[in-house]
Curated annotation (Swiss-Prot):
Functional note: Catalyzes the specific phosphorylation of the 3-hydroxyl group of shikimic acid using ATP as a cosubstrate.
Gene Ontology molecular functions: ATP binding; magnesium ion binding; shikimate kinase activity
Pathway of action: Metabolic intermediate biosynthesis; chorismate biosynthesis; chorismate from D-erythrose 4-phosphate and phosphoenolpyruvate: step 5/7
Gene: aroK
Chain sites annotated for binding substrate: D33, R57, G79, R136
Binding site for ATP: G11, A12, G13, K14, S15, T16, R117, R153
Record's subcellular location: Cytoplasm
The protein's name: Shikimate kinase
PROSITE patterns associated with the record: SHIKIMATE_KINASE
Biological processes annotated in GO: amino acid biosynthetic process; aromatic amino acid family biosynthetic process; chorismate biosynthetic process
PANTHER family reported in the protein's UniProt record: SHIKIMATE KINASE, SHIKIMATE KINASE 1, CHLOROPLASTIC
Source organism of the structure: Pseudomonas fluorescens (strain Pf0-1)
Cofactor requirements of the protein: Mg(2+)
S-adenosyl-L-methionine keyword on record: no
Lineage start: Bacteria, Pseudomonadati, Pseudomonadota, Gammaproteobacteria, Pseudomonadales
């Protein structure tokens, strides 16, 4: 396995589960959003405010291309990374892709106190999450080698499920 790449919506657990997977597999963990913040010295909301979503997505595309060129990392992506064809291609070719699926209700519960999510700065974050999932779910599934439910499951159980199911996949 080159890399293990986690995709899914905000609040699905990509960063939490990614760190646990990296520890279990003894691999480095990378979070594309955190890497963008480290590189720019600015947080994601600031980048959205100054450059708009297209400016952020340009940075994200460059970062995903760079991180997918690594060999032997666990990578957590931002929820919208799958919106660009180039990103989906890089992610699919960069390693095994696991789609961490979470219901909108779980996403709301997990993101409600997080002010670091520019797309949720709306009057109705639940509707925003529902609309985003309707658009992005088919794109996550398009590139996923595995789809794993995270609702009402402790992160450790999700990690064990992923490792067990990865071991059963044929080489590609």
């Amino acid at each position: 396995m080159r890399n293990l790449i986690l995709v899914g919506p905000m609040g699905a657990g990509k960063s939490t589960i990614g760190r646990l997977l990296a520890k279990e597999l003894r691999l480095p963990f990378k979070d594309s959003d955190k890497e963008i913040e480290l590189r720019t010295g600015a947080n994601i909301p600031w980048i959205f405010d100054k450059e708009g979503e297209p400016g952020f997505r340009d940075r994200e595309q460059a970062m995903i291309a760079e991180l997918c060129a690594f060999d032997g990392v666990v990578l957590a992506t931002g929820g919208g990374a799958v919106m660009r064809d180039a990103n989906r291609k890089a992610l699919h070719e960069g390693g095994r892709v696991v789609y961490l699926h979470a219901s909108v209700e779980q996403q709301v519960g997990r993101t409600s106190r997080d002010r670091n999510r520019p797309l949720l700065r709306t009057a109705n974050p639940e509707k925003t999450l529902r609309d985003l999932l309707a658009i992005r779910d088919p794109l996550y599934r398009e590139i996923a080698d595995l789809v794993v439910e995270t609702d009402e499951r402790p992160p450790r159980m999700v990690v064990l499920d992923i490792l067990d199911r990865l071991a059963q996949l044929p080489p590609r």
